Every structure is written in structure tokens, then in C-alpha cells.
């Protein structure tokens, strides 16, 4: 074989070898499986999200706790009675200033209180009533500590209006709002009110002084 032919054959074999090597490399690259990092990334992302969530929840918890503390403190402080309220918890009344047969209205804890200096005739009238006929049966003696002094809350037991004294069909009090009539003992006798006028806590500190509350 001539040297020219030999070189040509050698070059051809070299080219084929190069082509085969390139083909093998290409096949190897095409079969290469890239590692899957998704789970790792997802885990990191999930952990980051959880950490952020924990941070936000913790922050909101602290803010909520602080807000709740302020609310509770404000709520409790609203129950702290002021000096004015404490001063009105009890009211002293000088009875010598109230003539017999007359009413006086005082204010106690924001409510009207009726004080009636009853006459002997009024006391007798109150005691002559048959309590079996009353809607809210009460003896007059159970409503007073001293027969001549009747002390009641001036609030109609129907819807809370203030009755008028020395009025009505029974010589006691009349509520103009819905027509309830109370007798000289403050007992309901006619109209929609279900109960007698309420008796507040009171005491006589001496013969001339009444303490309401």
C-alpha cells in the first residue's frame, strides 16, 4: 500500500474514532440524571414559612395579651367607686323639717326616695285594708319601722316612671305613665304595676334623723 493511501486510511479511522467518542459522550450527557433538589428546597421553604408563622403568631399573642391586660384594667377600674358615689351610698335626712301629712323626695344613689310623714288617720287607713284583696299582699306594719314614717323608692314597679304624691284613687301615689294607683302604704291597688313600691334599706339613728342606705 502506498504511503498516501495509508495516510488516507489512518485519517479515516481517526475520524471515525472521534465521531464514536463524540457520540458516546453525547449519549452519556443525554442519559445524565440531574439530582432532584425539590424536596430539599421545599423543606427549607416550608421550614422558613413555619418559622415566619411562629414569629407572627407569637407577636400577635404578645399584642393580644397586652391589649387584654389594658382592657381588663380599664374594666376593673370602672368598678372603682368615685368619692361622690361613696358619699351618696348613704343619705342622712333631718326629719324635723318634714311636716306631718307631707311628702319629701330625696335623691339616693341616683334614685328618688319618697319620705312621707303620715298622720294618725293615714296610719289607721293603711291598717284597715284587707291584704287578701291586694295584688301584692303586705301588711302596713311590714313596710314601716315607725308607723308615722313611710320610706319608699319613688319608682313605679311597672316601667320605672316616678309616681305623683297625694294623687290617685287611694290617696297615695299615682303613676301618670300608665295609670297605676298606690295607697297610703305604697301598695299597688289599681293599674298595670305588678308590685308595691319598693322599700329601701334605712334606719333611724335617733328620733330626728333618718339614714337611707
From Swiss-Prot:
PROSITE patterns on file: RIESKE
Range of the transit peptide: 1-29
Transmembrane segments: 48-77
UniProt record, GO biological process: mitochondrial electron transport, ubiquinol to cytochrome c
Protein location: Mitochondrion inner membrane
Cofactor remark from the record: Binds 1 [2Fe-2S] cluster per subunit.
Record InterPro entries: bc1_Rieske_TM_sf (IPR037008), Rieske_2Fe-2S (IPR017941), Rieske_2Fe-2S_sf (IPR036922), Rieske_Fe-S_prot (IPR014349), Rieske_Fe-S_prot_C (IPR005805), Rieske_TM (IPR004192), Ubiquinol_cyt_c_Rdtase_Fe-S-su (IPR006317)
Superkingdom assignment: Eukaryota
Ranges for domain Rieske: 116-211
Stretches assigned to the Mitochondrial matrix side: 30-47
Family matches, as Gene3D superfamilies: Rieske [2Fe-2S] iron-sulphur domain, Ubiquinol cytochrome reductase, transmembrane domain
Reactions this protein catalyses: a quinol + 2 Fe(III)-[cytochrome c](out) = a quinone + 2 Fe(II)-[cytochrome c](out) + 2 H(+)(out)
Membrane topology listed for this record: Single-pass membrane protein
Function: Component of the ubiquinol-cytochrome c oxidoreductase, a multisubunit transmembrane complex that is part of the mitochondrial electron transport chain which drives oxidative phosphorylation. The complex plays an important role in the uptake of multiple carbon sources present in different host niches.
Name assigned to this protein: Cytochrome b-c1 complex subunit Rieske, mitochondrial
Species the sequence originates in: Candida albicans (strain SC5314 / ATCC MYA-2876)
Amino acid at each position: 500500500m502506498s504511503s498516501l493511501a495509508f495516510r488516507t486510511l489512518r485519517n479515516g479511522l481517526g475520524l471515525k474514532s472521534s465521531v464514536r467518542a463524540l457520540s458516546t459522550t453525547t449519549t452519556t450527557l443525554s442519559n445524565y440524571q440531574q439530582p432532584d433538589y425539590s424536596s430539599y428546597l421545599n423543606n427549607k421553604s416550608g421550614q422558613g414559612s413555619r418559622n415566619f408563622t411562629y414569629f407572627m403568631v407569637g407577636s400577635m399573642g404578645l399584642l393580644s395579651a397586652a391589649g387584654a391586660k389594658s382592657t381588663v384594667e380599664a374594666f376593673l377600674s370602672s368598678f372603682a367607686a368615685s368619692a361622690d358615689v361613696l358619699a351618696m351610698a348613704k343619705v342622712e335626712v333631718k326629719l324635723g323639717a318634714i311636716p306631718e301629712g307631707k311628702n319629701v323626695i330625696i335623691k339616693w344613689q341616683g334614685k328618688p326616695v319618697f319620705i312621707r310623714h303620715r298622720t294618725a288617720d293615714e296610719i289607721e287607713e293603711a291598717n284597715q285594708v284587707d291584704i287578701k284583696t291586694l295584688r301584692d299582699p303586705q301588711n302596713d306594719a311590714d313596710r314601716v319601722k315607725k308607723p308615722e314614717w313611710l320610706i319608699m323608692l319613688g319608682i313605679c314597679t311597672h316601667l320605672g316612671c316616678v309616681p305623683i304624691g297625694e294623687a290617685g284613687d287611694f290617696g297615695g301615689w299615682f303613676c301618670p305613665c300608665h295609670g297605676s294607683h298606690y295607697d297610703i302604704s305604697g301598695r299597688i291597688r289599681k293599674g298595670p304595676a305588678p308590685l308595691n313600691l319598693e322599700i329601701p334599706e334605712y334606719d333611724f339613728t335617733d328620733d330626728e334623723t333618718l339614714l337611707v342606705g
